[in-house]
């Protein structure tokens, strides 16, 4: 069976960010791999451990009662369109932003909690 490479690429171009994210997760699950760039083994192992302590992920745990306000806040934070932001909020718990400094992560947490969302930092 021959692959229609051009057709697959066309479908990927038309897909939303959420659809592409779901695709990556499905591929990771199906083939038991991780979508991460390769790194040098020696120095990178120490750097990853240090970076893990210095960076935080902001996870939307629950939208709460003011879902519309939370969607607007997620749009503002991520720059996503309305449909993608709504999909992200509906898929909670969902990581909204990754690799932030502690100060930036706390600012986003306060912003989301200010509109009624439940947020955790990881």
UniProtKB/Swiss-Prot annotation:
UniProt keyword Ribonucleoprotein, yes or no: yes
Keyword Ribosomal protein: yes
MF annotations from Gene Ontology: mRNA binding; structural constituent of ribosome
Protein keywords: Ribonucleoprotein, Ribosomal protein
Pfam family, one: Ribosomal_L12
Organism expressing this protein natively: Lacticaseibacillus paracasei (strain ATCC 334 / BCRC 17002 / CCUG 31169 / CIP 107868 / KCTC 3260 / NRRL B-441)
Record gene name: rplL
Protein function: Forms part of the ribosomal stalk which helps the ribosome interact with GTP-bound translation factors. Is thus essential for accurate translation.
Signal peptide: none
Name this protein carries in UniProt: Large ribosomal subunit protein bL12
Tree of life domain: Bacteria
InterPro entries recorded: Ribosomal_bL12, Ribosomal_bL12_C, Ribosomal_bL12_C/ClpS-like, Ribosomal_bL12_oligo, Ribosomal_bL12_oligo_N_sf
Subunit structure: Homodimer. Part of the ribosomal stalk of the 50S ribosomal subunit. Forms a multimeric L10(L12)X complex, where L10 forms an elongated spine to which 2 to 4 L12 dimers bind in a sequential fashion. Binds GTP-bound translation factors.
GO cellular component, one term: cytosolic large ribosomal subunit
Classification via HAMAP family: Ribosomal_bL12 (MF_00368)
Family: Belongs to the bacterial ribosomal protein bL12 family.
An individual GO BP term: translation
């Amino acid at each position: 069976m021959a692959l229609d490479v051009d057709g697959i690429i066309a479908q990927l171009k038309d897909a939303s960010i959420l659809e592409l994210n779901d695709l990556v997760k499905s591929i990771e699950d199906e083939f038991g791999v991780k979508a991460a760039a390769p790194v040098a083994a020696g120095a990178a192992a120490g750097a990853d451990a240090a970076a893990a302590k210095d960076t935080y992920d902001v996870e939307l745990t629950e939208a709460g009662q003011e879902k519309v306000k939370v969607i607007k806040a997620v749009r503002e934070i991520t720059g996503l369109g309305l449909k993608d932001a709504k999909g992200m909020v509906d898929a909670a718990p969902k990581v909204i932003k990754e690799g932030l400094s502690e100060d930036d992560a706390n600012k986003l947490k306060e912003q989301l909690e200010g509109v009624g969302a439940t947020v955790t930092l990881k």
